Amino acid sequence: FFYLARICNHCSYPACLAACPRNAIYKRPEDGIVLIDQERCRGYRKCMEACPYKKTYYRGTTRTSEKCIACYPRIEGKDQAGGGLPMQTRCMSSCIGHIRLQGLIELNKDGTWKEARNNPLYYLIHIARVALPLYPQFGTEPNGYYIPPRWVSRPYLEQMFGPGVDAAIEKYSAPDRELLAVLQLFGKDQRICHRYEIKEAPKVFETEVRGKKFVMHNDTIIGYAKDGTKII
C-alpha cells in the first residue's frame, strides 16, 4: 500500500473531450489545460464515463460537470503573489511534503516536446527518465508524471506506470549528480521554474547504494522563471 495523489492529467488526447456530445470540453492551445464550458454543459455525464482516471464530477446543484481547472489564472501569471510570473497550481505549491513540481514546456508542430535540456520537467521525463505517466496504456497521453516508489511490488508498479519502472527506480535509488540537484527544486518556490543551472562544488560524501556507487557533491542549483528572473 502507498498513497498516490491522483489529479486531472490534462491529457494530450483527453477522453472526456472526445466523449462530450455538447462540445463543452476544450483544450487550451496556449498551455494544454482542459476545461469545461459551464454554459454549454448540460450534465449528460458522458465525460465521467469516458475519463479513465475518473477526474470529472457531476454537481447536482448546477446540474453540470466540473473538473480541475489547473488554477489557470495562476498559470497565466495573474496571481499578485507571483509578480506577474507563472505560478504553480494550489495543490502543487501547498504540498507540505515538497514532492510536487509543475512546469511548462513548448511543443513542436507534430506535438512532440521541444528540446529544453535545462527545463526541470524535460530533464526528469526525457533525460533521466525517472518520471513516468500513470496508466499509459489508456492511450490518452496524460501530462501528470510520477516518480515510482522503491518499496512497492514491481508487477503492480509496472501495471500503473509501464515498462520503464525498473530503470526509473534504479536511477532514482542512487541518483547521479544532476538528478540529485534537480530533485532539490521540488517545493522550493511557488513560481514555475523554466530553467536551471548547476554550480558545481567539491565532493562531500561517497557510499554504495544497492551495489551502485553514489557520490554527493556540495553543488548549488539555481532556478529561473520564464523571464529569466532568479527564483530559486
Residue ranges and their predicted role:
Residues 1-5, 9, 17:
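A structured beta-alpha segment of the ubiquitous adenosine-cofactor-binding alpha/beta core
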Residues 7-9, 39-43, 115-118:
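N-terminal start-of-chain detector that recognizes signal peptides
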Residues 11, 71, 147-149:
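Structured loops at beta-to-helix junctions and adjacent beta-edge loops in soluble globular domains
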Residues 13-40, 46-65, 70, 77-109, ...:
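Iron-sulfur cluster-binding cysteine motifs and their immediate structural context
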Residues 42, 52-53, 73, 117-119, ...:
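General N-terminal targeting signals
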Residues 80-81, 92-232:
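Long, compositionally biased charged/polar accessory segments in the mid-to-C-terminal portions
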